[in-house]
Curated annotation (Swiss-Prot):
Top-tier EC class: transferase
Record bears the keyword Nucleotide-binding: yes
Pathway listed: Cofactor biosynthesis; NAD(+) biosynthesis; NAD(+) from nicotinamide D-ribonucleotide: step 1/1
Protein name: Putative nicotinamide mononucleotide adenylyltransferase
InterPro entries registered for this protein in UniProt: NadD/NMNAT, Rossmann-like_a/b/a_fold
Binding site for NAD(+): S40, F41, T97, G129, D131, R165, N206
EC number per UniProt: 2.7.7.1
Binding site for ATP: H48, T214, R215, A216, R217
GO cellular component: cytoplasm; cytosol; nucleus
Amino acid sequence: MDQAKKYANLLDSFRSSTEDILLLERLEVSDKPIYVLDSSFNPPHFAHLGMCLSIPKGSQLLLLLSITNADKPVAPAAFNERILMMEKLKTLIHNCTVSVAICKHALFVDKCRSISNKLGPREQVYLVGFDTLIRILDCKYYKEKAMQQVLQPFFSCSQILCFSREVDGTTTDDQAQYLEKIKKSLLPNIPSQWSEKIKLTKLKGNVGFGVSSTRARQAIISGDEETQRKIIPQEILNVIKVIQPYRHR
């Protein structure tokens, strides 16, 4: 696929540049909040699409891929192949203006700063799953400084919209209780006022139930087409069949 080579070249140029974030599509200047779906997109699935379709009509949305991950090694699919899949995901989102973006930062506070520098000082709303929320508030990622000190700038200009769904043995009740513990200052190193910046919501219907990138990859590698269709939009499956990003597994 010529597009795969194009994105491979783009990534090479980006890595060697002084830029720390790159938007593949231009967004109009605005003072309205910008929504950010930061994910590995490995591959994009129905839960990703459901999150994107849940934001207010007419909003601006970044599909953000970090080429530096805090705790996940680089594995198939390659980054240029993920961008191809992200661009296809973008075509399925009709309620807002979307740009695919790549960045060099692993931590959300650094991503937030880069977006502010690129798009101006506007509120950012991060669309995350519960597993990502837990990682954002995990002290192990902030060893050099206290987590409160590092994350305060992030929460001063950002909100987290956390999509609660039962996955990996964690119930929605467990997730709601976690936020209640933050509100009541029952979790060490997490100020209670941060709970005002975190909102729990749910995807409509059964969208996202049992969906994860790990399960999607397993279904692709094993050839389980029925599970693939349940987890991954057909348009993205069509791209996967052409570029075969998991062929080396």
